[in-house]
Amino acid sequence: MARMHELFHYLKDNKGSDLHLAAGLEPRIRVHGSLESVAGWSTLTHEALLSLLREICSEEDWADYMKCGDLDFAYGLPGVARFRANFLRQENGCGAVFRIIPEKIIPLEDLNLPKAIESLAHLQQGLVLVTGPTGSGKSTTLAAIIDKINNTYEKHIVTIEDPVEFVHKNKKSVFSQREVGEDTESFGAALRAAIRQDADVILVGEMRDLETISLAVTAAEMGALVFGTLHTNGAANTIDRLIDAFPAEEQA
């Protein structure tokens, strides 16, 4: 078993949410908000950590990481989970953080959310934003809503993410899951294409810039049901963030 796979198994078995690796430190996992050392592992040197990370990285992605010092991608370990990976370069050497993504999408009914949330899956058009800080469950909530649509309606659903997190299987709906940097140049390019691809539902992984926000609003105005995420706290802050993304002359 690859040593990275050992760490992924440990993360899942100990109900952790994130795995942190950094040169000069022992591996740690986040459990209920606190970072805990991984049992049986000692401090990782820069060279040892590079060797670990190389185990799960394609030649092309590794070349990008060596050149740019940052890399985002998703990695799947069958029977365990998928992992959202971020490689980085820092003052003391290399580092990486992995967020665990469950292999199976949790049904909306099992998330103990308000009943009103389920009604979002039955909307025909509009813009729905799921907001909150990192780790608050935005992706899990959206995956459950999209899965509800998939089980209920015959729709064309386009997801645009960086990277793709939850993998959806075609049930009643048909999916086009696109990864920024792999399947499309940018969120904006994929959104423009989705409008031309007869998309009924569009999931935007992150409303990160003016172009993405503007195109998402346009897609909703044209009849699509658009879901997206923002790192904000509360509805009022979300409205402010959306408005502030536009130039002053367009905010009125």
Residue ranges and their predicted role:
Residues M1-A252:
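Short, flexible helix-loop junctions that flank or precede catalytic/ligand sites
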